[in-house]
Amino acid sequence: QKKDKKDKFYGLM
């Protein structure tokens, strides 16, 4: 799955 980028982005929020 290519969702790690978005996950990290939201994780920073």
From Swiss-Prot:
Annotated family: Belongs to the tachykinin family.
Biological classification of the source: Eukaryota, Metazoa, Ecdysozoa, Arthropoda, Chelicerata
Subcellular localization: Secreted
Keyword Metal-binding attached: no
Species of provenance: Phoneutria nigriventer
Protein name as annotated: Tachykinin-like peptide-X
Modified residues (Pyrrolidone carboxylic acid): 1
Keywords: Amidation, Pyrrolidone carboxylic acid, Secreted
Cellular-component GO terms for this entry: extracellular region
Tissue specificity remark: Expressed by the venom gland.
Residues that bear Methionine amide: 13
Cystine bridges: none
